[in-house]
C-alpha cells in the first residue's frame, strides 16, 4: 500500500516502467469511457447514420490514434518540448484565430470552435490548453526570478489574455475558465508573490462574473442552474434530464445499455453529459468508481510533479502540475455540471467523452506526464534510450 503514496519504488530498476497506478487509472477511464460512448450514442448514431455503433468505432479510432501519438510523444525528451514552447504557443494562437475566419472555421450550434481538415474536425481550443501549459512551464523555468516581479508576472497573464479573447470570440467560455484557473495554479506554484496571485484571482473572477452577467445566454444558464425545475422544458432542460438520469440509476443502475435518457431526452449524451448516462446505467457505484479513478489519476500526477521538483527537474515539475490542474479541473467541472452543482459549461469529461481532438490531446498530456516520471526516476535510461 505504501507504494501508492510514493514514486520512488522503481528508481533502482534497470528497465524503465511507467507509473502503473497512473497508467492503470488512465486506461480504465478510457476503456470505460469508450464503452459508455458506445452505449450513450446508440440512438443518435442510428438516427444520423443508420448505424448504431458509429460513434463507438469512431471513438475507438480516435483513442487508437491518441495512443499511437502518445507513444511517440513519450519517446521524446522533455528538453525538446521546453525549447518548442514559444513556437507551440504561437501555433495555438494562430489556430484559434483561424477558427474565427468565415469559410475556414466551422460553426456548430452558434459557436465557431472547429477547423475542417477533410473528413475530420480539429478543435483548436484543446490544443491551445496543451500548448499553453507547455509554454508556461518553460517560462517559469526561464524566468523563475522575474515571476516574483510585477513585469514577469504580467507577461504570462497578457499571453493568456490574448488566448482568452480569441476563445471568447468563438465563444468558448468553459475553455477560458479552465485556462485561467490553470494559469493561476501554475503561477502560484511557480513562486509568484501572494498579493499578485490574489489580485489576479480577484480581477479574473470579477471579469468572468461580469461576462456571465452581461451575456443573456450565460445568465440564463446561471439562473437555470439555481432552479432548473422552474423551466424544465426550456432553460433547465439539460440539467433536469441529467438529474432524472441520476435518479433512475439508484445504487446499481438500470444496466449497461438500458438508459432511457439517452433516447433523445438528454442532449449531448455521448459528450458533455456522458457521466449522467453512466450514472443511470451503472448507478451510484459506477459513478463513485469514476470519481475514484480520477482521484487516483490526479493524485499520482501531483506526486510525479513533486518528485520531479525534488529531483531538480523544474520544467517537468511545472509541466506535471499544469497538466494535472487542467485535467483535474476540467473533470471536476464536467462532473459538477452533470450532477447539478455547477452551471452548464460545455466541457467534455477528459479521457471519457466522445471527441477526436479532446481524446488525442488528453492522451498526449498523459504521455507527457509519464515522460516526466521516466526522466525523474530513470535519468540515465532516459538519456541513453530516448532521443
Swiss-Prot record:
UniProt KW Plastid keyword: no
Biological process annotations from GO: cell wall organization; FtsZ-dependent cytokinesis; peptidoglycan biosynthetic process; regulation of cell shape
Pathway(s) per entry: Cell wall biogenesis; peptidoglycan biosynthesis
Membrane topology label: Multi-pass membrane protein
Gene Ontology molecular function: any one: peptidoglycan glycosyltransferase activity
Places the protein is found: Cell inner membrane
EC number per UniProt: 2.4.99.28
NCBIfam families the record matches: ftsW (TIGR02614)
Name under which the protein is recorded: Probable peptidoglycan glycosyltransferase FtsW
Species of origin: Nitrosococcus halophilus (strain Nc4)
Lineage, broadest ranks: Bacteria, Pseudomonadati, Pseudomonadota, Gammaproteobacteria, Chromatiales
